Amino acid sequence: AAAAAGKSLDEVADIAQYTADNMATLAVAMRGATHPVTGAVLGELPDDEMEIGMGQHGEEGGGRCKIKTADETADIMVDALVKDLELQRGERVLLLINGSGATTLMEQLLVYRRCVKHLADLGIEVAANYVGELLTTQEQAGFQMSMVRMNDQLLEYWNAPCNTAYFKK
């Protein structure tokens, strides 16, 4: 959007760097992915456990724990991202919930609903959002949560029309 608005390459690079510096992501998995060719399970998890911080392809992450409710999981992840970004009351974020592949849109929306409430309780506004699947892993149950600290310029670019092969708004 910045390039389409006529920004120079240096300006676009600065905006991209600001975004990268003000973004954090955390994933949770309730079931590991499967290899699309061999069917081998990548990152096997017991049925009663989940892993917060698991990588996109089953890499071990921040630790395993007993399965928690969607609200409990959302709260843990929001708190971790808010801390990582050092977000303060009055700030705005872009909140993205990306389904891992075997997580339904309804489940993703339940997590999103709780995130919005928890962030509001912390005095942080969800100024923009995306809930759905952008990057998936075959048969992995879980999701990634990303937050980006928003300023007026980023919000303007996020809200600009977009029409690519995969992402449209």
Region locations from a protein language model:
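Hydrophobic transmembrane alpha-helix bundles
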Residues: 5, 47-56, 64-75, 123-138, ...
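Mixed-charge interfacial surface used for oligomerization/domain docking
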Residues: 7-109
